[in-house]
Amino acid sequence: MKEYLKKISLVLATCTFLFSCDKFLEENPKDKLPEDDVCNSISEVYLNAVASLYTYVGGYSDSQGLQGTGRGVYDLNTFTTDEAIIPTRGGDWYDGGFWQGLFLHDWGIENDAIQATWEYLYKVVMLSNKSLERIDKFAENHSDAELPAYRAEVRAMRAMYYYYLLDLFGRVPLVQSSSPAMKDVVQSERKTVFEFIFKELQEVAPLLSEVHSNQTGPYYGRITRPVVTFLLAKLALNAEVYTDNDWTDNERPDGKNIKFMVDGNELNAWETVIYYCDQLKVMNYKLEPEYETNFSIFNEPSVENIFTIPMNKTLYTNQMQYLFRSRHYNHAKAYGLSGENGPSATIEALETFGYGTAAQDPRFDICYFAGEMYDLKGDIIKLDDGTVLVYLPWEVALDITDTPYEQTAGARMKKYEVDPTATKDGKLMENDIVLFRYADALLMKSEAKVRNGANGDVELNQVRSRVKAARRPATLENILSERQLELAWEGWRRQDLIRFGMFTRAYNSRPQLPNEETGYTTVFPIPEKIRVMNTKLVQNPGY
């Protein structure tokens, strides 16, 4: 296994020099995609047109990577919700009002992090387009058996990145060339983008391997058929949102009337969700007997995780910054790591988990640090003044400066097993970062059944019984709560709240913005600097 990982790391290290970072829609980009031919053999096609793209799925700097880093996709999907909050703690975590702005939905059209996220996502789209052009050029004079699968994998990568653009920004340009002329770039309606992504994924799925890509081997960390199947289910689940070209009129299409052709049968959106979730079961995904297994230090053998970001502190540069950001300095120091004393659970999250009650959900102690803190040997952790470090979940608020709880308010992120051998302040750890997993698919199926007029109790309680939680009826309210209980800290809350029509409501520390009842904040603005470079791009309504 180690020899295999060494080979993969060499591939990825090499690839970082082969693709430069192209800022989509920039009038005079600093770096151009290389035009020299670097695909002269099938092995070079894999190296330079397929494997190279995976260097961007994870990351180590702000706004890069789908998860693991700050001020990017994950933060936009997490700290804009009732799940997590980063309180201002005196001189810490104000950062020009950035974190408060996210939580309050007051981000504006010139937000640097939103622009950097747009540029990151389009960078991978453009690199995927370049890869497809290289594969097609190679195929003109070669007929290697691997070519159709390689091309399908790159199309799937591009579709996945368009999925994130669709979810975050709504109406975006659909570009299928690596060097589009500025005058030819136009904005597509949200429904058009959705239909393109769905069609692409349906077409490539049969060409991809069914291997579980979270497990080490030739497909480790790659997009395989199960990853595409999960994405198809997720797209269908959100079809009412994604096919709505005007998300500010408080009217949505009905999922029962949104039709898809799936394996020769016409299915509505909810039937489509159920079909693809069932396909994951056929592909031998199941719940791990122990919830924690999915987030353990060596979680590659998980039969539940579907798509992960590979982590290896000696081979990869991918970072997991979230645990580092959340733990108090002395808490992290007790593990031999570092911390920034930041992100915490919201009051709403505590209430959903039933924190401190007789009915507290069993997953709370798995997902959060709360109360007195102990090191890995069981010794009490103390603050600098000699008092015991006690996290106080209920004292959390958006600004706790000059309060007695400035340093200790808030339940902190746990979920992933502590890797005491992690390096770079604890950000380079061995636990692979979980992006997609089967428990989510079961909850998607439960929701789809209920929305389609059927009973979703079986799937909901299959997830709950794994952690020995009491049975509940599968109402939409209970399903939304269960998604927070099961998927805390996994980056799904914003999407879930939007689908359930609850993203713009007021809650603790967050009043509703003027006109927010229209739903305009359910998508982010097209970055203003991007619009200046291309005046054809129309700003999203409300901004």
Identify what each model region corresponds to:
Residues D22-W99, V172, Q202, L207, ...:
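An aromatic- and glycine-enriched ligand-binding surface/loop that stacks and positions planar moieties
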Residues S43-A51, T55-S61, G65-L66, T88-F169, ...:
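Conserved, well-structured interaction surfaces
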Residues P393-R437, G542-Y543:
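Active-site beta-strand/loop architecture of penicillin-binding DD-peptidases
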Residues M1-S9:
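Bacterial N-terminal signal peptides that target proteins for export
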Residues S20-C21, L121-V124, F196-F198, Y219, ...:
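Long, intrinsically disordered, low-complexity segments
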Residues E3, F17-E44, A159, I197, ...:
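Bacterial Sec-dependent N-terminal signal peptides
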